[in-house]
Amino acid sequence: MRPKQVWVSVAFEGEWNEKKPYVTESIEAGVDVIVCLPEDVERVKELGNVKVAVPLMPESPGSPDLALEELDAIDADVVIVGKGGEGDGSIDLPDDISESIDAALIEKARDRGFEVAEYVEILDKPYERFAAEIAKNVGPDYVIAIGRDWKIIPLENLIAELQGEKTQLIAGARDAEEARIAFETLEVGSDGVLLDAERIDPSEIKKTAEIAERAAAERFELVAVEVKEVKPIGKGDRVCVDTCSLMSEGEGMLVGSTSRGMFLIHSESLENPYVEPRPFRVNAGPVHAYIRVPGGKTKYLAELRPGDEVLIVDTEGRTRAAVVGRLKIERRPLMLIRAEYEGVEIQTIVQNAETIHLVREDGEPVSVVDLKPGDKVLAYVETEEGKGRHFGMEVEETIVEK
């Protein structure tokens, strides 16, 4: 599942000091896009590195080129078409999408190198149809669907229509609760939501960003695998993954020697008599091992770089993304752990040390030096045959990993 986006609009007439608190809150909450008027783009970008969208407001349907030339002079990332056009009812809807003025503007903006969003107020069924048609036939990067007076709209039809299209659906929401509904509709949900700063308290921005993060989180069905073998195997280069996040007891990362079977390696968040806890760290294993990262992908531990994202996973299989801050690669004694689940054999290699833990089936951490055949620990196992990975992406092919 791709990340859910949060957009915040401060594109209203007013003093900058009225808009600034919303922009600051948006940047601190990590929103994806801030919508503002052209004269505010520079001010927004001075406050933080954030994508900025600007409405294209031609004075008349005949002057779009002039408006686009004016936008060329500012540092906007996304152009929003539809305000003052067909999208908001200022111009009648076309009989055919090939005659659409908004569609022509989308093409012109795209030719100038902008990302493009089509703004559509869903005033009635024909406007819902127009939003779907422009997504399918013109392919803007985004369609922003807003209800009349920003009232929440039924998204089921648009979500179903846009399944498989490259255009992302951004739904208008009046608060965090409406955002949650948008993200959960038909299980898939909208790709993002747009909050209007004129209609919300700034606190709704952070709440919505948190909901978006949870909505996009992957979840794994962890199973209890039976340990078959535990043995020292000599020295090798192992990797500690130091993140920019703190982990709690019961959290770690999924790591394994094969992509179809990965053990939950516990974080160094536990008290022990040897070293101080380092709750930002997972001593993950040797350089060859796979680790789960967002988007249904894996990476080799040796491939990770500062700034990459990895998945933190808890004992219930819930996930959250964390940014890698540092990798520590050191030569250490290693241990092979081999396990089995429903006839599928999986294995991993870890540092042979008291401070490295897996997780028992009851959720309790267990040091790898205390593991023995017959013990059961938590892991993620892909039991479906015929799937392999190329460059970390799951593909249908025959690959045997031992």
From Swiss-Prot:
Single GO MF descriptor: dehydroquinate synthase activity
Keywords: Amino-acid biosynthesis, Aromatic amino acid biosynthesis, NAD, Oxidoreductase
Catalytically driven reaction(s): 2-amino-2,3,7-trideoxy-D-lyxo-hept-6-ulosonate + NAD(+) + H2O = 3-dehydroquinate + NH4(+) + NADH + H(+)
Role this protein plays: Catalyzes the oxidative deamination and cyclization of 2-amino-3,7-dideoxy-D-threo-hept-6-ulosonic acid (ADH) to yield 3-dehydroquinate (DHQ), which is fed into the canonical shikimic pathway of aromatic amino acid biosynthesis.
Transmembrane region(s): none
Gene Ontology biological process terms, A to Z: amino acid biosynthetic process; aromatic amino acid family biosynthetic process
Leading EC class: oxidoreductase
Alphabetical list of InterPro entries matching this protein: DHQ_synth
Superkingdom of the source species: Archaea
Any Pfam family: DHQS
EC numbers, comma separated: 1.4.1.24
Family: Belongs to the archaeal-type DHQ synthase family.
Phylogenetic placement of the source organism: Archaea, Methanobacteriati, Methanobacteriota, Methanomada group, Methanopyri
Protein name: 3-dehydroquinate synthase
